[in-house]
Amino acid sequence: MERLQGLLLWLLLSPSVVWASRGPLRPLCRPVNATLAAENEFCPVCITFTTSICAGYCPSMVRVLPAALPPVPQPVCTYRELRFASVRLPGCPPGVDPIVSFPVALSCRCGPCRLSSSDCGGPRTQPMTCDLPHLPGLLLF
């Protein structure tokens, strides 16, 4: 009987193992281009710019049966290596710093979410937009 249960378990799992080995249905964690908005409440315009961010699927596990154990931490797609770039907001009055710095993803990894450096929320239904009048283009340096 034990042998039969083992065979049944193998038959149930083997098609999913073969299917799963063909690759994930979602793109894995990697740098992707994204358009972001930069503004300062003291400057008259908002600008958008394109940078690399980390995005994609990270394999995770969820307990099927309720347990007294704490939940399994879910990994998120986050920076492995990054550099910082800056944009200059035009039209800022004297005494207001017109420079906005932002991270540029060079490589990514799946790991724990660090709220100090990442937005660990899920995908947004609305893109981040400007509250101020929008000035297209970018001034990177």
Swiss-Prot record:
Glycan-modified residues: 33
Cystines in this chain: 29-77, 43-92, 46-130, 54-108, 58-110, 113-120
SMART domains reported in the protein's UniProt record: GHB (SM00068)
Claim: Secreted is one of the keywords in the record: yes
Recorded family membership: Belongs to the glycoprotein hormones subunit beta family.
Cited function: Promotes spermatogenesis and ovulation by stimulating the testes and ovaries to synthesize steroids.
Protein name (Swiss-Prot/TrEMBL): Lutropin subunit beta
Organism, scientific name: Rattus norvegicus (Rat)
